[in-house]
Every structure is written in C-alpha cells, then in structure tokens.
Amino acid sequence: MSWAGKILRVNLSTGTVASEPLNMAWAREYLGSRGLATKYLVEEIDAKVDPLSVDNKIIWATGPLTGTMASTGGRYTVVTKGPLTGAIACSNSGGYWGAELKMAGWDMVIFEGKSPKPVYLSITDDVAELRDASHLWGKSVWETEAELKKSAQDPLVRVSSIGLAGENQVLFAAVVNDLHRAAGRSGVGAVMGSKNLKAIAVRGTKGVGNLVNPKEFLRVTAEKKKILAENGVTGAGLPTYGTQVL
C-alpha cells in the first residue's frame, strides 16, 4: 500500500493551512478513500448539520492504491454531508487529480469553515496556500482550469473545480477535474460553492513510494487487470455505457 502519511487541513474562515499526520489506525480499519474520509467526516461534524452551512466539512481523499499502476489507481473521492439528500455524500472521480495529490505527498485534504471571498487552494509538493479566486468566480470549470495552468506556467498542474452551478449551490452540482472527469453525485459541488472555494490546483513531483515489494505488486496488478478486461461488465460494459451498467 502507498500512504503518504499526512493530510492537509484547511480552515477557510481563518485562511490557515496546516499539515497533520494521517490516522494510520483508521487507514487500516477503514480501507480506501471513501471509508477513510467518511470516518473523518462523521467524527468531526454534527449529524444534524446543514450541508450548506459553515459547520459542514468537505474532504478530498485518495486511497492506498492511488498513484500506483493498480486498476482505478487514478481515482479520488469527495466526501461531505450532501445537500441533495441530507445524507453522507461520497462522489468519485477519475483522471489524474487523485494521483497528483498523492505524488505531492498528501493522502487527503479537509476543508472546514467558509472563506469571506472566493479562494482556491494551490498545492505544490509540501507547499500549500490559499489564493484569491475573485477573478475565477463566474468562470466555467474549463476556463478555470486553463487559467490556473496558465498562471502556474505548468501544463501538468491538475485542477479540481466548480463552475456556475457549484457557485450558485445547485443541489446536484458536480466537482470537475481534468476538463471532463467529474465527481458528479450528491451535490458535492454545491458544498464547495457554499464555502467560496473555487478550485484546488495541485502539482506533485515526489512520485509514489512505500511499496514493500514493487516487483510482486506489478505482477499481481497485471494479473488483476486481465481479469477485469475479461469480465463482461468491467471489460465491455463500463467502457461502452458508463456506470449505468453497475
């Protein structure tokens, strides 16, 4: 497994960003991005919190295989209390963003509070800071991604952002990364908008370590990929019809 061993905690109300160790006991017990982030969420918020209030939290999480060559190793999960149902929202997305966060040295980002103005979080390896996003507010996710890559002068920056639906707290608003990938379930984008959080731009150059036996890992990964390719659902159904076949 490949845990970086640390998370970012961002207080949008105060504008502070802090590093803290990943709870490894929880990481072992609640395996995977969805389970681990949900554990953090239920421990930190009141079950009756208004999803669009300042007291709700929203988490971007990776899992122990994120950033590796394992199948689905590029995925990440956004977890919060969702405005669409009032239940825990776990929305998953593919692309490069999840792996980039892991390669920057982080397993998870937890946002709490609410910013008084539009902001985005910039992460470059160990350096993370909140920046003004007033110039991005009102722009589409495609415009936002292009602008952040241009300002960073780096086409490999990966961006997870909201568009106008999220800004206006539409209850089914998505979070979009890599132009066409979306955490599209349960209105996680609306929670992002309620906090005046426009985007997270991340660039990682550290790679992914901590594999105990890389050679054996690659062998098993190739074996499992073959099984998935030969399965009617994962091998043919998903590429053709998407998640509606599940």
Regions found by a protein language model. Give the residues of each.
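Intrinsically disordered, low-complexity segments enriched in small residues
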Residues: 1-92, 99-246
